[in-house]
Regions:
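Charged, heptad-repeat coiled-coil alpha-helices that serve as long linker/dimerization "arms"
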Residues: 1-128
Length: 129
């Protein structure tokens, strides 16, 4: 059960990094922008200019994907914490492999998203070295 306690600590330590990632990804701003774009898409005459309509729908799709990736990581974290707490409560070692693999996967997802953020947007013009 010590391993589960260790993973609970690891999960609690990684949670602030998940929140920092939300800030880096501008998730709240993305949600506001997405609401604005959805209102625009639902407005009368939106499809009158197909070029603009395609641009707006593409932008909305990109924002939806970004928000969905972040929310998936949050759900993944919640699920892992639940597994950890259940295993500790029930004294069940059978969930350890799932927890270990899930934690590794979450770390990789977060690192991939962090790197993508660094290599795009406002940081894109910076030198790699």
């Amino acid at each position: 059960m010590i391993e589960f306690d260790e993973y609970k600590v690891k999960l609690n330590n990684i949670h602030p990094k998940l929140k920092e990632l939300a800030s880096s990804l501008n998730i709240e701003e993305c949600r506001v922008d997405l609401d604005r774009l959805h209102a625009q898409i639902e407005s009368d005459g939106f499809w009158d200019n197909t070029d603009t309509a395609q641009k707006v729908t593409r932008q909305a799709s990109q924002l939806e994907a970004k928000i969905e990736r972040y929310e998936k990581m949050c759900t993944h974290w919640d699920d892992l914490m639940t597994i950890c707490e259940m295993a500790i409560e029930e004294n069940d070692d059978s969930m350890l492999d799932e927890l270990v693999e899930g934690y590794k996967s979450l770390e990789e997802e977060m690192e991939r998203e962090r790197l993508e953020t660094l290599l795009s947007g406002e940081y894109d013009g910076n030198n790699a070295i």
